[in-house]
Amino acid sequence: MRTLLLYVVTAVAEIVGCYLPWRWLKEGGSVWLLLPGALSLALFAWLLTFHGTAAGRVYAAYGGVYVAVAILWLWCVDHVRPSAWDLAGVALTLAGMSIIAFQPRL
């Protein structure tokens, strides 16, 4: 459960860190959005160091959680209801993430 929570917090940090500069560029937001965006990306990189396995495996497993959090962001922040295809994609990526993240350690 701790691993999953860490993945979710890491994904939120990455999404916020990318969303704020996007909002500045795409929607003419304040240039001050870049500061919390940069801090959020720094937090994202720092959080990755807490994942206790090889970096490649962390990134692969984290990708599934990122997809799920991004679709949740779509719904909660962008106010776009996810389609059945979105939800099927999330289910598939979380299944893949679970296989990678929770494999037996030999």
Curated annotation (Swiss-Prot):
Compartments where found: Cell inner membrane
Similarity-based family: Belongs to the UPF0060 family.
Lineage of the organism: Bacteria, Pseudomonadati, Pseudomonadota, Betaproteobacteria, Burkholderiales
Annotated HAMAP family: UPF0060 (MF_00010)
Signal sequence interval, chain numbering: none
Gene source species: Paraburkholderia phymatum (strain DSM 17167 / CIP 108236 / LMG 21445 / STM815)
UniProt KW keywords: Cell inner membrane, Cell membrane, Membrane, Transmembrane, Transmembrane helix
Ranges annotated as spanning the membrane: 4-24, 30-50, 58-78, 82-102
Name by which UniProt lists this protein: UPF0060 membrane protein Bphy_5052
Membrane topology qualifier: Multi-pass membrane protein
GO cellular component: plasma membrane
KW Cell inner membrane (keyword) present: yes
Domain of life of the organism encoding this protein: Bacteria
